[in-house]
Amino acid sequence: MRILVTNDDSITSEVLLPLAKWAKQFGEVTVVVPKYEQSGKSHCIEIHKAFEVKQVPFDDPDIKAYTVDSSPADCVRYAIEGMKLDFDFVISGINRGLNLGIDMLYSGTVGAVFEAACFGLPAVALSTEPGGFDEAMDALEEVKEFFIKHDLMKKNSLYNVNIPKNHKEIRITRMGGRYFADDFLLQDNDMYLPTGKSVWKDSGDYSIDTNAALTGYISVLPLTLNRTNMDVFQELENLNH
C-alpha cells in the first residue's frame, strides 16, 4: 500500500515526522506538504503561475519528502498527477487547531482530503488543539482500531477526525454550524486584521462535531464530496420530463 501524507501546517510542523513514521505500518509513505503554512486555504489550487516543488531532507531514510510552494490541495494534486504515483490512501494532518462545523470548509487540511476524493482516493483529515500533538499521536491507535472494528472505510471513504486534548471516547458526528464570529481591526493604511472569537454554546447534542469535540470527545465525521442536495434533486427531478 502506498500512503500520501500531507498537511496545511507545512514542512515545519512538529508532528509531521511522527505522523509519517506512524503511517509506515500501512505501507510505503511519501510526504508532500506545503513549503509554507497554508491554514485557511480550503480547497484552492493554483492555475495561473508555476510553483516550486523540491525534494527535501527528512529524518527517516524510508520516507521521501517534498515541499510544494502552494496549497494543500495542490500538494495532493501534484503528488498524484505530477509525480505519477499510484497512492492508495491519503492522510492530511495532524492540524494544529480543531477543524469543526462551518470552519471545516475553510480548512486546508480538509481541503486536501477533498482533493484526494476528486481522484477517488480514500482519505482522512486529522486535527487537534494547539498543544495537543502528543495526545493526538497517542490516540491514533485507538482511532485506527475504531475504524477497523466498525469497517468505517468500507462504509465511507472520507472522514474528518478531531482529537481534543484530554479526550474521552470516540463519537460519530455530523457537521455543526458556525462557532466563530469574525471581526476586522483597522490597521494603518487601510489595512484590516481579521480576528474573531468563539460564539459556541453547548446545546447538549453530541452528535454534532462542535459539541462533541469541544466537550472532549474524539469526533469522527463522515464527509462527502458530492454537494448535490439529493432530497431536493429527487423532489424536483420530475421537472426534467
Give the location of each predicted region:
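Alpha-helix C-terminal capping segments
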Residues: 79-84, 113-122
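Electrostatically charged, flexible surface regions
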Residues: 137-241
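A cross-family phosphate/adenosyl-ligand binding-site feature
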Residues: 3, 13-86
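Glycine-rich phosphate/pyrophosphate-binding loops
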Residues: 117-137
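Active-site metal-binding loops of divalent metal-dependent hydrolases
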Residues: 9
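Short beta-strand segments
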Residues: 6, 32-34, 92-95, 126-127, ...
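Glycine/threonine-rich flexible loop motifs
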Residues: 98-107
